Amino acid sequence: MTDKLTSLRQFTTVVADTGDIAAMKLYQPQDATTNPSLILNAAQIPEYRKLIDDAVAWAKQQSSDRAQQVVDATDKLAVNIGLEILKLVPGRISTEVDARLSYDTEASIAKAKRIIKLYNDAGISNDRILIKLASTWQGIRAAEQLEKEGINCNLTLLFSFAQARACAEAGVYLISPFVGRILDWYKANTDKKDYAPAEDPGVVSVTEIYEYYKQHGYETVVMGASFRNVGEILELAGCDRLTIAPALLKELAESEGAIERKLSFSGEVKARPERITEAEFLWQHHQDPMAVDKLADGIRKFAVDQEKLEKMIGDLL
C-alpha cells in the first residue's frame, strides 16, 4: 500500500519548509523554502559550522567596516545554506529578503539583486532561485519590478485576499498563503477552538485564492504554507504546491493510504477585474483584522530572528 506523502505527490508538488539538509535527503522534495527563522535554526546545526565560517571569512574580504561585514556575512550564510540545499533538490530554493525592508520597495529590490548575485557568482542560475518578499504593497511592487528583470519571486506572509489579488495582478511567480498562522489567530481571538479540516479558516482562505486564480487564468503558483496538522495538508491536496515542515512530512510518509484530490479547476476562465489600486488594497486588507495582525506579527518575528542571526555572526567577526 502507498503512503500518504507519495499519494499527495500525484496531485501536488511537495516542497520542504526547512533549512535542514538531513530532512532534504530523507524526503526528497522538489523545492525548498527558507526564512530568517529557519536560517537561524539551521545555523545552530554543527554540520553547518563550516558554512558560517566561510561566510564570515568572505565578509571580512569584502569590507573593513564591521557593520557591513555583519550584513555581508548574514547574506552569504543564507546563500551558503541555499547552495547546500540545491545539491539535494532538483528545483528551486527560496531565500528571503531582510524583513526590515518590507516597507521599502527600492531597498528590497537592491537586496534581492544582491542575493541573486551571490547565487550567480556560485554558478547558480536564476531559474533555480526564488526571492522571498513579504506581501506588503511595497514588497509586491518590488516583486513586480524584479519579475520584469527575470528574477522570480515568492510572496510570503500572505493572509488576505487583497494581498493575493495584488500579487496575481503584479505577475509574481509564486505566493505562499499561510494556513496554520490563520488558524492560530482564530483560535486565540474567537471562542471556537476546534475546526474540522474543511472548515479550518486557513484552508478556506487558500481554497478561495486557488479558485480565484484558476477562474481568472492567473499563472501565479499557489503554494500553501505554515501547516499545523496533516488534516490541513490533506484538505489542500491538488493545490499547485505545498511547503511542509519535516515533522509533517514524516507523519505523511508513515501514514498508509491513498488520498483524495480536493482542489482542481476545470471551468471556464472569466475576464479579470481592473487592477487593484494601492488605496483599495490597503482598505480591503485592513478590513481583515486577522490579516493585519498576522502580517505585522510575521514581519516582526522574522526581523527579530534576523537580528539574532546578525548578533551571532557579529560575535564571530
UniProtKB/Swiss-Prot annotation:
Sorted alphabetically, the Gene Ontology cellular component annotations on this record are: cytosol
Record's catalysed reaction(s) = D-sedoheptulose 7-phosphate + D-glyceraldehyde 3-phosphate = D-erythrose 4-phosphate + beta-D-fructose 6-phosphate
Keywords, ordered alphabetically: Cytoplasm, Pentose shunt, Schiff base, Transferase
**One GO molecular function term?**
transaldolase activity
Record Gene3D superfamilies: Aldolase class I
UniProt entry tagged with the keyword Cell division: no
**Keyword Kinase (UniProt):** no
Q: Which domain of life is it from?
A: Bacteria
Pathway listed: Carbohydrate degradation; pentose phosphate pathway; D-glyceraldehyde 3-phosphate and beta-D-fructose 6-phosphate from D-ribose 5-phosphate and D-xylulose 5-phosphate (non-oxidative stage): step 2/3
- Coiled-coil-forming residues are none
**Where in or outside the cell?**
Cytoplasm
The entry's active site is 132 (schiff-base intermediate with substrate)
Q: How does it assemble?
A: Homodimer.
Q: Which family does it belong to?
A: Belongs to the transaldolase family. Type 1 subfamily.
User: What is the official name of this protein in its record?
Assistant: Transaldolase B
What gene codes for this chain?
talB
